[in-house]
A protein has these predicted regions:
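Terminal, contiguous helix-loop blocks that mediate binding/assembly
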Residues: 76, 83-183
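Divalent cation-coordinating acidic motifs and surrounding scaffolds
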Residues: 1-69, 74, 78-103
Length: 183
């Protein structure tokens, strides 16, 4: 809730199904999911696919500012073929995206922030590779919980007229500080 009139566009690529584009919209306090498009089967871990989807969204939903949340598995700077192909970002089936490919898939200077809901993406190697992609990068240097970031609490902060990234970080920290599951 509290999207402040903004557009929350979701590229969703569930395992075993073709990707789809969704819009999450709030009307009179009610959150609605609107199906925008089905894509043909494509490799979502391909930088050309990423760039194409971002370009499509930006052209269809012009805005004064953009943020990007990337959710997947992440293993920072280690190459994608290291130890069972588990060292990169963005899994689609058996395909993984190297960090330099991720940088190729993201346009320069478009995003106010990139938030990684993925493990290990706050390394200096990752942030350096993505240095021209966003003003701010929010990420964890270690594992993140499978439940992901507390989006219900963070959405008002991400969609505020005055972007509240410090509060997003505090919300993330406090959420996991106060949540003992699964330990």
């Amino acid at each position: 809730k509290n999207l402040n009139g903004g557009n929350l566009i979701v590229y969703y690529a569930p395992a075993g199904s073709p990707p789809e584009l969704l819009r999450i919209k709030e009307e009179n306090g009610v959150v609605k999911k609107i199906h925008l498009k089905d894509y043909e089967k494509q490799n979502s871990a391909d930088p050309d696919v990423m760039r194409s989807v971002i370009s499509e969204v930006v052209s269809q939903y012009p805005a004064g500012s953009y943020g990007l949340v990337l959710w997947s598995h992440g293993t920072a700077w280690l190459p994608s073929d290291y130890q069972n192909k588990l060292k990169a970002f963005g899994q689609d089936g058996n395909n993984w995206m190297e960090i330099d490919d991720l940088a190729k898939g993201l346009p320069d200077d478009l995003f106010d922030f990139i938030l990684f809901d993925a493990c290990y993406m706050a390394s200096v190697e990752c942030t350096y590779e993505l240095r021209n992609k966003a003003e701010y990068i929010l990420a964890s240097p270690t594992e993140t919980m499978a439940d992901g970031w507390p989006y219900e609490e963070m959405m008002p902060q991400l969609f505020a007229t005055d972007l509240q990234l410090e509060k997003v970080g505090e919300t993330f920290y406090n959420h996991f500080l106060n949540n003992t599951y699964p330990y």
